[in-house]
Design a protein with these regions (language model features):
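Exported/periplasmic cell-wall-interacting domains
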Residues: 63-153
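N-terminal post-signal-peptidase region of extra-cytosolic proteins
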Residues: 1-9, 29-43, 75-82
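"…centered on the first transmembrane helix and the immediately adjacent amphipathic helix/loop
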Residues: 56-57, 62
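Glycine-rich catalytic cores of cysteine/serine-nucleophile enzymes that process amide/ester linkages
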Residues: 14, 22-51, 57
């Protein structure tokens, strides 16, 4: 199947570290994978290509809600929690779980975005945007991921 930019709900520019919603005229800064760009399993890289939002997680979650394995922990992120768990990869507020649409590139054996658990998700607001720092996911500020969550199908 072939896709066009006109069909896209979300456009991510990894070189510019931006996410656009053309249909809503919205623009956000992001942080992608610190290991660079790529589709390989266990690479820590952010995948390229056509994707869809497979699952939206956290519909009614409070801002700064903490998720582990896509489940709310009951915790609300704050500095004390950050100091208690300094090595935790914080997934906050909302999760958009991505699924690749290109067999052999970002879907299937060894490269599957969905099976790699690649999300668009909230991160602590103290984390910088425009600098690749994630483990492969797309990180956003919490107010912005909450807004995005409400705008995409």
């Amino acid at each position: 199947m072939s896709y066009t930019l006109e069909q896209a709900d979300i456009l991510i520019d990894l070189a510019q570290q931006t996410l656009r919603l053309p249909k809503h005229n919205k623009f956000y800064l992001i942080s992608s994978g610190k290991n660079g760009i790529g589709e390989q399993e266990n690479s820590g890289k952010t995948p390229r290509g056509w994707h869809r939002v497979a699952q939206k997680i956290g519909h009614d979650a409070a801002k700064y809600s903490v998720f582990i394995a896509r489940q709310p922990t009951g915790e609300i992120y704050n500095q004390q929690l950050a100091q208690q768990f300094p090595q935790r990869d914080w997934i906050l507020s909302r999760i958009l779980w991505l699924d690749g649409l290109e067999t052999g590139f970002n879907q299937g054996e060894g490269c599957d975005t969905f099976k790699r658990y690649i999300y668009i998700h909230g991160t602590p607001d103290t984390e910088p945007m425009s600098i690749p720092m994630s483990h492969g996911c797309i990180r956003m500020k919490n107010d912005e991921i909450i807004e995005l969550f409400g705008l995409v199908p």
